[in-house]
Each structure stands twice: as C-alpha cells, then as structure tokens.
Regions:
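Residue-level marker of alpha-helix boundaries and capping positions
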Residues: 5, 30, 104-105, 167
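Short aromatic-enriched loop/helix-cap "lid" or pocket-rim segments at secondary-structure transitions
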Residues: 39-40, 102-106, 171, 198-202
C-alpha cells in the first residue's frame, strides 16, 4: 500500500485503518499541507515508511530542470528529517517515472533524473496496481475497491492518494485490505528488501 500527496486530515484516518488490520504502508509526502505534519510522525511511529514525493508537487516547478527537481527534493527531505530525525532515501516522482507531463517543461528530464537520483543514493518506486483514485475527487468507493482488488501479482505496489479530497479512498480501504488478506497477502512498508517497481521512462 502506498499513499501519495499527503499529509491531510485523511492521513490519520488511514493510519487508524492500518492499525486495525495490522497493515503497514508507505507515505510519499509533500510539503503542501504542513498543519497535518504530525500525521507524518504518527505514521512513522506506527511502523510505516515515510518517503518523498516532492515539496511542491508542482509539475512546472519540479520538472523545469534537474536542479529545480533536486532543490525541491531537498526541501521535502529537510522537512521530513525535522519531523522524524531521518532523511528518507525512497522517492516517487510526481506522476511516476512514466508521466507524460515533464516533457512540457524540460524535454528528456526523466531519463536524466532516472540516473541522477541513483547517483545521489535515492531509489524511486512506481506502482503496478492503481486504485484509480486520482481520476477525480469523487471516484466512488466501490470503484476504488474494484480497481484495487483486480491485481493478482505475487508482489503488488498499490497506488492511493491521501490528500484532502480523497475521502472515498479512506472509505474503500478496509474492504481492499480484507480482500487481499483473504487471499493470503501481507501488507509491508517499503524497505531495502522491497522489489523495485519502475515504469518505462517517458520524456
């Protein structure tokens, strides 16, 4: 389970559900909603992994140049380190490594970032199963359940969002966890042992 774009008021709700089911997740956080930063601390204390999305999540900013990307990444890294005492080394690119948006701002930047993040000691994670909750802010909970439980891989990296509008994601989460648990899956946070999920890079 991975959650992008938090923290928000929904993050604590997600954490309660994870705790109830003894499930762990990874939160790719931003700096856009810092009044909920205590949720980052709680998530980490609960045994989840805190990872970096970007500080602004503004495509025009982060994908304008490699320098702009790493300046933004440093900001979110510093913020998380201030909260948890740790500088995360796991990241997720806004839109994923296969995003079709970055080329509007800097042609070829994703290929450059692909190698540069590794040179700087980071690892990035995409996903191989999507909840579809990014399609709009009003995706019905049942649609999210259906999308999320439609994957049968041995190792699943499932994409959710825990930003403010994603209330139906929270609503859908218990049924998704129950479905996978009934099929014998275990929910782990990303660690150095986690299989790496990369999309094909688009530029």
């Amino acid at each position: 389970l991975t959650f992008d774009d938090g923290p928000s008021e929904n993050t604590d709700k997600v954490l309660k559900i994870l705790k109830k089911y003894d499930a762990k997740a990874t939160f790719f956080v931003t700096g856009n909603n810092q009044k909920y930063n205590d949720s980052i601390r709680k998530a980490e204390k609960q045994g989840n992994t805190i990872a970096l999305h970007t500080y602004t999540h503004d495509y025009a900013t982060v994908y304008s140049s490699t320098e702009a990307y790493f300046n933004d990444l440093q900001q979110i890294s510093d913020m998380v380190k201030q909260i948890t005492g740790k500088a995360p080394k796991y990241i997720r690119f806004p839109g994923g490594s296969s995003n079709m948006v970055s080329a509007n701002y800097s042609q070829g930047i994703m290929s450059k970032l692909d190698s540069m993040v590794h040179e700087r000691g980071y690892e990035y994670f995409d996903w191989n199963c999507s909840s579809g909750d990014a399609a709009s802010n009003s995706v019905p909970a049942q649609t999210i359940v259906d999308n999320s439980t439609n994957c049968n891989y041995d190792q699943i990296m499932l994409l959710f969002h825990d930003s403010s509008p994603k209330t139906s994601t929270v609503e859908a989460l218990p049924a998704i966890i129950e479905n996978y648990k009934s099929r014998g899956y275990v929910f782990k946070a990303i660690s150095d042992d986690t299989p790496i999920f990369h999309h094909g890079v688009n530029n």
